[in-house]
Amino acid sequence: MNSEVLLIEGASLMNIKLESEQISKLMNYLKLIIKWNKSYNLSAIRTMEKGVYKHLLDSLSVIAYIKDKSLLDVGSGAGLPGIVISIMRPELLVTVLDTVGKKCRFMQFAKTQLQLKNLNVIKNRVENYQIEFCFEQIISRAFSKVEKILKLTQHLLCNNGEYLLMKGAGFQQETLPYGVDIQSLCVPEILGKRYLLIFRREK
């Protein structure tokens, strides 16, 4: 079974119907990751098949929780999940942020190659990143512990904004904020449980 079929069928199992343009861009994005990996070491994933599950489908698992205006992906690395979200939601302003130059160069290249006009690539430390507006949602897939993420990014989130923190089962050992909403994520072929921690900032 080829990688494109794995993507389509995996997304279908998550109740996500992909359009042809989305499939094309997602597959081309994954090919870029695999190609650049040879020189840039962007990810431990080296094959298209594993990339479909570990990168694309894992990132797609949060799509139902994404709102309409602005999203910041902190510690985005190769652009996960931010670039996947940008492909799926072209009307949404997506900012991907990382401190590592080679990863930001890759994300900028992917933006150009995939013509993602709604994507903004930032090389900076999140605690030093300053903006004139605020983000409706802040997402993180593999950046840091919950307590540290909240501390470093609080100046960037709108009142009534949301944190979306993607975690494995180990999050249970962390200090969690009061009122956190814990959602199980269904990702085909992923060993180990995946969770989305949702924390809403009140006025």
Curated annotation (Swiss-Prot):
It is found in: Cytoplasm. One of its GO terms (molecular function) is rRNA (guanine-N7-)-methyltransferase activity. InterPro entries: rRNA_ssu_MeTfrase_G, SAM-dependent_MTases_sf. It is an enzyme of class 2 (transferase). The keyword Methyltransferase applies. Coiled coil: none annotated. Its main location: cytoplasm. Transmembrane segments: none annotated. S-adenosyl-L-methionine binds at residues 75, 80, 126-127, 141. It catalyses: guanosine(527) in 16S rRNA + S-adenosyl-L-methionine = N(7)-methylguanosine(527) in 16S rRNA + S-adenosyl-L-homocysteine. Its EC number is 2.1.1.170. HAMAP family: 16SrRNA_methyltr_G. Belongs to the methyltransferase superfamily. RNA methyltransferase RsmG family. This is Ribosomal RNA small subunit methyltransferase G. It comes from Ruthia magnifica subsp. Calyptogena magnifica. The gene is rsmG.
